[in-house]
Amino acid sequence: MMTFRLMLLAATMMVPRMAQSQTNDDFVKGADVGFLTAQEQRGVRFHDREGHERDCLELLRNDYQIGAIRMRVWVDPRGGSCDKHELLAMGRRAKALGMQLMVDFHYADSWADPSQQPIPAAWQGHSFKQMKRDLREHTIDVLTLLKENGITPRWVQVGNETANGLLWPMGHIKENPRQYAGFIRAGYDAVKKVFPEALVIVHLDRGHKQSLYDWNLDIVKKYGGRFDMVGMSLYPYWAMRDHPELDADSIISDCIRNIRHVSRKYGCDVMIVETGFETNEEHPEVMARGWQQLARIIREARNDTEGRCRGVFYWEPQCLPGYHHYHLGAFDSKGAPTIIMNGFIDALMQPLR
């Protein structure tokens, strides 16, 4: 068993520039960087492990094999954060670096997740038919802006962590399952109208919970919803907070098993579109475990899913500890990558012995 001290020595001796040799397969390593614009506007500067100031996206791309970014987009956000213009600007930066783009439609003016799926203010009081039109027009408007500026997303999410539906209560999955599926279909059709080759993703949380995926996706299929790919969130940290009896290893194993199950049952590819691990600068052993777990997830998602998992995205790796009260980023308080980021590097993605 490799000791913790030897693990750290191996990590610090690793020259990140070696990561520039990309894998030959089509497996994607990605990063959701929705906070990045706001961070840069607030003066946050990023550095590599040697202390050299670097552009954040360039650092992710060249040192850690991050080949794609994921960007959320809100309908009418207060202050303009995460709007279509910010999406376009980040899309241009990614394209200049040869990175691919995933667009994550929240269909809300702010955060949408399993605990909240608020209807945008401008859509309030609309009928189901009108709200489907709203969703369709918003999707087409955002994607057309990208297309007119030469940006082509490879993947588009129609909703964010829609385990319980979206646009509540109109599209709540328990109260109105048919309408939930109708919104998914409206989003799918809108994406295909602008970008026929884009892969449309239905995204759910708790990737380790097979029963959730069976229940939700069966409803989507039953009532005419369509998707090309299933996106999963995988957060051992949050799963263990909610269920202390669980452990990270079993959660990861259950997710890998669920990827195989979902791909077989629904005949589609799968991606882990969100994951993250605790950054605790006072306890480096916590971050070392995060490195091991991220490396394991990437390794097994690529090698042990019958070729059906197409990638892993880290949610806000460039997030400094405590930014927006979040502690699952992978950079330290000085804006430099922690050991967690080494999970992306092929040379360190072998089982520790």
Provide a role label for each language-model segment.
Residues 23-25, 55-65, 89-100, 144-151, ...:
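Acidic (Asp/Glu)-rich catalytic clusters
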Residues 28-30, 67-70, 100-102, 152-157, ...:
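Structural preference for beta-strand elements that scaffold enzyme active sites
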Residues 41-47, 261, 280-296, 300-353:
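Aromatic-rich peripheral "rim/lid" segments of glycoside hydrolase catalytic domains that contact
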Residues 23-100, 106-135, 141, 157, ...:
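N-terminal substrate-binding region of glycoside hydrolase catalytic domains
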Residues 19-21:
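Boundary at the C-terminal end of the N-terminal hydrophobic targeting segment
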Residues 33-36, 74-76, 106-110, 158-163, ...:
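Active-site beta-loop-alpha junctions enriched in small/polar residues
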Residues 83-88, 113-227, 240-257, 281-294, ...:
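Active-site cleft segment of glycoside hydrolase catalytic domains centered on the general acid/base Glu
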